[in-house]
Amino acid sequence: MDVVFLGINNIGMKIYNWLCQRNKVDVIAMVTEMEQLDIVQKESPDLIISVGFEHLVPAEILAVPSEGAINLHPSYLPYNRGMSPNVWPLIEGTPAGVTLHYMDEEFDTGDIIAQQKVQTEFSDTGKDLHSRLEDAQFELFTQTWPKIESSNIETTPQEDTEGTYHTTADFVDACELNPEREVTIKEFLNTLRALTFPPFDNAYVEIDGTRYYVDIEIREETDESGDKAEGLVSSY
């Protein structure tokens, strides 16, 4: 099977290297920029695989491969299509997960091949969830690959009624904390932990013309042995 791989991020490179070790797969090109997509029409691969490719692929490119084009997206579709899918489950309470789906002319809307949910905890930051989603992406792809390779795929259309979509602008807006806005403590903590991704500075507040960056660490209470504590008893 001849494959053109679209990708640029860490998990994309990991899956690319994994595919290159498969005996029945020939990854004939790796594409990281839009202007490189013409190689698909030149090479006419059997399959396009996209992992971390942030551009919308034109319909004429998607129509070339005989086995179609598939994308691995780090969200539980139809929730959190688009950008920063590690952030919105923590802010909005939507399910976190990963999805393998066919590509169409919109972002992350194609028929679902396989997906799995990823558990979140109240102590999670955006970085924690990002790491967990990367692990789940690799697991889902490698487990599903035999079905893809043998063309033994059953798909499920996405439900549009509950889907969500976010842009880079949504993330930028979320990073600006309004000191005058009234929110619950839980909502505030959810926003801070979702935007905490060291060493990057994301969430910030501006006070008297000065910008202050904010992140957070939430720790679950434990007893002296390191186990979760049931409660505290003080004696005087």
Residue spans for each PLM region:
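One-carbon transfer enzymes
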Residues: 1-236
